[in-house]
Amino acid sequence: MERRQDRIRNFCIIAHIDHGKSTLADRIIELTGALTEREMQDQVLDTMDIERERGITIKAQAVRLNYKAKDGKEYTFHLIDTPGHVDFTYEVSRSLAACEGAILVVDATQGIEAQTLANVYLALEHNLEIIPVINKIDLPSARPEEVKKEIEDVIGLDASDAPLISAKMGINIEEVLERIVRDIPPPKGDDTKPLKALIFDSLYDNYKGVLAYVRVFDGVVKPNMTIKMMSTGAQFTVTEVGYFKPGMLIPCEELRAGDVGYIAASIKTVRDTRVGDTITDANNPADEPLPGFRRLNPMVFCGIYPTGDTKYEELKEALEKLQLNDAALFFEPESSAALGFGFRCGFLGLLHMEIVQERLEREYDLNIITTAPSVVFKVTKTDGEVLYIDNPTKLPPPNEIAKMEEPMVKATIMVPNEFVGSVMELCQERRGIFKDMSYIETTRVILTYEMPLMEIVYDFFDALKSRSKGYASFDYEFIGYAESKLVKLDIMIKGEVVDALSFIVHKDKAYQRARRIVEKLKEEIPRHLFEIPIQACIGSKVIARETVKALRKDVLAKCYGGDVTRKKKLLEKQKEGKKRMKQVGEVEIPQEAFMAVLKLED
């Protein structure tokens, strides 16, 4: 006897950026007739403008498609679109947990890249059935046979009968659909057991509140049930359940084991629906949650301050709105003597930070200034207390610190072998510890390094791309904390510390960094009528100094020839005045000066 679930296939598509993931999704949606040709547009599943422009997927999306296979049966596909970028690894792993299989898209001209590898390993950890697919075979530079061999050597998947497709031209897409039916196992699950559903994403809807995107593993969920979140114990009453068609929500009577869809339960904030959490029936709860849930901790912090005509309240409102859809974004109010009131924000990584900044500027039309990104340091004080510090101004004085540790990451870099030397040199400069090196075929190398996150946060990615002419790809994962010689560098302008410019830096690099900053500030701060010393110091020791010279009026202009004592008197008087000004004068530091220092490239 055939079970209802035997005709369901849950799968996702994994690929490196630009290998054609969203295009393949578009073709699959078109072939299964989910959208008419009139409604089709490129990258159907990427709903944010930024996603389309950068060609990346940030939020996971899910659609239900019906497909009539060659065996005459009608199948239900749930395609879950996952983000491919390293910052969103946890979201990817949750999306993968909602599937039974994955389509691995590899570009026939590029071969395997670092992020493909990272996501494939995630898929293997979840025991997914992986179907390799080779895309872009319509391009003259395609080399499908070599790429097949690469997939077999590097990942160990049998790619001998991998479908060769062109998502753009729509070649061989049907073969992929047939492989999905044939190779991906149907969901296992039991309608009669207590409800267990995995949240793999959530979205804030202005009318329905938060929609939790779920994959039901056991049981049934329908409206008017009381559900409970297993990590927080919060309870809600379901108001609507349904599934996704591209760009639409279709309400239905119930979601059963094996289904993918959404649950609306007038939930107020995304915080209550944490990605990876398990939803269960409050009256008949499951014994234990689905595995793999963890709280997301921000890794990178920076200050965001309003400038120009943007008000603090507007910035606060915008951040709150962004947070409705982005549970990983963290922010708290902070004030700085130099920049006024603003927020300290925490992000998953650099891309996440850039996207949030860009959305604030574009979607909410705000003018903001951001301080240099920093990471979370672990500080053990002499009395044994352990602090986690995300803001250099909160660092205790040096005599109270027993040791400081910084976050380390394991970086995997794939690079063509002619650039190995310069990439290794870059990693050495960034205090990387060499771990491993292996060759793919004869042309490409995988390098593994352990590196301080602080060194990557700054502009590692750009430096890597420029040293390898854009060919290197890069992926990192957090591995823990390691002790390090770190110092806090303060910048003093006319004897006063400017809090917005303080940062924590490695001892060996402190001097170079300090030198560059004071030189930059000297260019940026306009001359006043008195001289302004700019000093960089560690504790009370000044390690670099520049002076902005004073402007002076020519007081002797009116003395022709005249008596030398008269000239002396005027000069003395000017000197007195300058001295007095130096004591009471205020230094105006323009906004551009801050921007210039925060943007200092290595």
UniProtKB/Swiss-Prot annotation:
PROSITE patterns: G_TR_1, G_TR_2. GO terms for molecular function: GTP binding; GTPase activity; ribosome binding; translation elongation factor activity. It catalyses: GTP + H2O = GDP + phosphate + H(+). Keywords: Cell membrane, GTP-binding, Hydrolase, Membrane, Nucleotide-binding, Protein biosynthesis. It is found in: Cell membrane. CDD domains: EF4_II, EF4_III, LepA, lepA_C. The keyword Iron does not apply. One of its GO terms (cellular component) is plasma membrane. Its main location: membrane. Residues 6-188 form the tr-type G domain. GO terms for biological process: positive regulation of translation. Its EC number is 3.6.5.n1. The keyword GTP-binding applies. InterPro entries: EF-4 (IPR006297), EFG_III/V (IPR035647), EFG_V-like (IPR000640), EFTu-like_2 (IPR004161), G_TR_CS (IPR031157), LepA_C_sf (IPR038363), LepA_CTD (IPR013842), LepA_IV (IPR035654). GTP binds at D18, H19, G20, K21, S22, T23, N135, K136, I137, D138. It is a peripheral membrane protein. Pfam families: EFG_C, GTP_EFTU, GTP_EFTU_D2, LepA_C. NCBIfam families: lepA, small_GTP. Belongs to the TRAFAC class translation factor GTPase superfamily. Classic translation factor GTPase family. LepA subfamily. This is Elongation factor 4.
